Amino acid sequence: VRVKSQRTTLTSILSLQKEGEEVIREGSAQDVSKKDFRRIVRLRGLMAETQLTDHRFHSKDLEAFVTRALTAVGLPASEAEQVAHLMILADLRGSDGHGIFRLPQYVRRIKASGMNVRPNIHIVQETEAAALVDGDNGMGHLVVGFSAKVAIEKAGRAGIGWVGVRRSNHAGPAALYAMMPLARDMIGIYMAVGSANHMPPWGGIELLLSTNPIAFAIPALEEPPIVLDIATSVAAYGKVKTKAQRGEGMPIGWMIDAFGRPLTDPKRAEEGFLLPIGDYKGYGLALVFGLLAGTLNGAAFGRDVIDFNKDDTTSTNTGQVIVALDIARFSPVEAFKRNVDEVIREMRNSQRMHGVERIRVPGERSHATWLERSNIGIPMNDTLFKDLQRLAADLGVDGLPS
């Protein structure tokens, strides 16, 4: 199914709670013509209209499908819709390893009682500026969504809201949650303990660390926000899994085996481990983020981390942190955003190295992907499409349009 290009609005709003509170806004509310859309795509070195893909779906069709599937395994409809929106927002932004790709895995865990479909997500203890949230083994998207709301409310009162999370689950891309405070003119920060250990300590071979991601979201006035979303490994493990599904090889530098030899076949990933960014520096960051998101909150870290790719039944006790900073406590909001615009343009317009077409800032590529896929739909390889159709048949729900 190919979705025709059309005018679209540069606004993406997620309602976290049932009352429909706006907690995320991406870009500025302005129409983008087809001409402008093509200009943006060219800046990415790609004409989306000619990009080859097996299937392409409108985001609303995918959201509806995910909602049907999650409702079929016991999630209340309103909560299934929240999870579906976040999962497909991941796909819209190009995080293909964290979107609908994960649905079969989530369904398996729910059916095996590895996740709680009726969790009592609650605050364990709190102060004016901090809180600890217990997710009761609920879906990570719901747990972190709840926690982001708490952080935003606390930042509104105290200037900062730091919320630690325990007994959560895999929640998708870090950027989704770091961006939630943007709608309140706040800066967002998110950290997490990954849902499986794929890295050893620097110089070791025992898998004691995950890809422990961090994300920052900083609003701008006219430019899209700065959104830095990075794993502490060179590549997130979700990218390895999507490479394997597509039958593609991995670049040298993503993984090595126990003897230090490059590993490029994603189907042999179990024979090696991911490499950290910046060598020992990435190892140090993964360790610190794990202590802040895991150990500090009473969540799993190190040997206690459950590999949710292999174990569908055991509670993962995943730990996360969401932080909101109220810009107005430090600087006039509009002046700050204008200064961010200036910094973005200074970076983008600086002198380029020979052969470099464009200097980008963090989040620019994901924002362009969001524009592209909002216009022409989300691509899907045939293997994933068939997996999802089989899942629909197993659950007794309508599948994707073919």
Model feature map: region roles:
Residues V1-L46:
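Intrinsic disorder/low-complexity segments
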Residues A48-L62, F301-S402:
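Catalytic-core signal marking the mid-to-C-terminal active-site face
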Residues A48-S59, A64-V83, I88-L89, D96-G114, ...:
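Acidic, glycine/proline-rich low-complexity segments that act as flexible tails and inter-domain linkers
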Residues H98-I152:
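Active-site cofactor/substrate anionic-group-binding motifs, chiefly glycine-
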Residues E128-L221:
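A generic, well-ordered mixed alpha/beta core segment in the N-terminal half of proteins
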Residues H198-K267:
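Phosphate/diphosphate-binding glycine-rich loops and adjacent basic-rich segments that engage nucleotide
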Residues Y237-F301, K310, S315:
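Small-residue-enriched flexible segments
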